[in-house]
């Protein structure tokens, strides 16, 4: 049975007559890296603020670590970065972590050294944060979130502004956390391709609504270049494709859609083939090219 670290049931956040989030049903399995994808303004940060207790929900339920009561206690197991967290620019990385350690009442001073080594800043020495690169600041922010060894890590847009090398470093670090510490991670981004080689499952937010949740395997299937058509007669359509179009590389889906993975430059030919045979009616025919088409 799948164990969920985080669940929401019909979670909503309303500002007067505007829903920033509406009836969101989210499930994040233990040990996964969950990619929360949505354009700016989709509700990603609002959702994260509700999960971490920085804002109050209007409706629905939040369940953390299997519990919907005493969420304040459950949230003590969460580490998070929301947008770019405040760092003390005149301090070193070590000093920043020490301030956070004291504020949180973490007794183990060794956690500072361990965290610096984990995030790759053990050699930063006396260099002030003001002189850090953006990538170094992002890693330090991650280090702050990791203090206390949280079981659930929530990162809001952590790849913003990172160069390709920085993204790769972050990706490897997060994978290491999952593998070695069994941390579950929620990571948000408005660019799906930034998460494509990192996340193991995905949720897509649009205008405050969670459109769908899919696995990496399902996403890869979605991302294969294909022609998608919908029909009210699957059997006749597939016979036409095979016998008259000589098309055999396709998949049929429960929603009466067919995805064709060959003849991708011949959409017009396929359209003509179907329209010239009155036994088949179709309502949707287009080619998917990239992640952004989803």
Question: How would you label these PLM feature ranges?
Answer:
Residues 3-6, 13-187, 192-206, 210-212:
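ABC transporter nucleotide-binding domains
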